[in-house]
Design a protein with these regions (language model features):
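Beta-propeller blade signature
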Residues: 106-122
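Signature of short aromatic-glycine-proline-rich micro-motifs recurring in repeat-based ectodomains
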Residues: 70-79, 156-158
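N-terminal signal peptide c-region/cleavage motif recognized by signal peptidases
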Residues: 14-16
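Acidic, small-residue rich beta-repeat scaffolds with periodic aromatic anchors
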Residues: 5, 18-50, 57, 120-183
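Sec-dependent signal peptide recognition
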Residues: 2-12
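Short beta-strand elements that form the blades of beta-propeller/WD-repeat-like
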Residues: 34-44, 85-109, 148-156
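A short beta-strand motif characteristic of beta-propeller blades
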Residues: 61-67, 127-130
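Repetitive beta-architecture junctions, highlighting loop-to-beta-strand starts
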Residues: 48-51, 113-115
Length: 183
């Protein structure tokens, strides 16, 4: 009986200590994925002003941005059976905004952020191409329909994207959206 209690206590202690493993000091956030530990390092804290993402301590992504992280609305990821992140949408905010066009009413329009989808479901991480909503240049992620073969990503401006085989393509630019999705 005492031996069972000791084993249960040791299992509890090891589980709790693993769950509260600290992020490195220069990382802004850490997450556990199907392939291991993910660390976000924002460019504003780096001498070269480049944001980075590390997987198990190895750099897998770098961008000219001052901030990087998981999309915060709660739909930007899907978990595997062990409750680790399997697919994830990452946003990053550019160091230098990107000129898009001049609008007669609003003047010059700029893009401040972009997105990529990270897929940890295979033996190696797959990082999608860069994508962003075109109709409203500061639209946030609204919802994601995660699937085994493909996923649909929708933004607040009504634009929709499809992720399949490591690539994201726009399937609706949001300009003709009259449904309840555009609010």
């Amino acid at each position: 009986m005492i031996l069972r209690a000791m084993v249960a206590f040791l299992m509890l202690v090891s589980t709790v200590s693993y769950a509260f493993e600290k992020c490195p000091e220069d990382a802004t956030k850490c997450s556990t994925t199907t392939l291991g530990k993910l660390e976000y390092i924002s460019g504003k804290s780096q001498s070269d002003k480049q944001s980075r993402i590390l997987l198990n301590g190895n750099e897998i992504f770098k961008s000219d941005s001052y901030q990087i992280g998981e999309e915060p609305n709660g739909d930007g990821f899907v978990l595997d059976k062990k409750h680790n992140i399997n697919k994830l949408i990452v946003y990053y905010k550019f160091n230098t905004q990107q000129y898009i066009k001049t609008d007669p009413t609003y003047g010059d329009l700029y893009r401040y952020r972009a997105y990529r989808l990270f897929d940890f479901s295979g033996k190696e991480v797959v990082i999608s191409n860069e994508f962003y909503p075109p109709a409203d240049y500061d639209a946030h992620l609204k919802w994601v329909s995660w699937g085994q073969k493909n996923s649909v990503i929708t933004f607040e401006d009504g634009s929709r994207f499809k992720y399949e085989n490591g690539h994201v393509t726009m399937i609706n630019n949001g300009e003709s959206d009259t449904s309840e999705n555009k609010q």
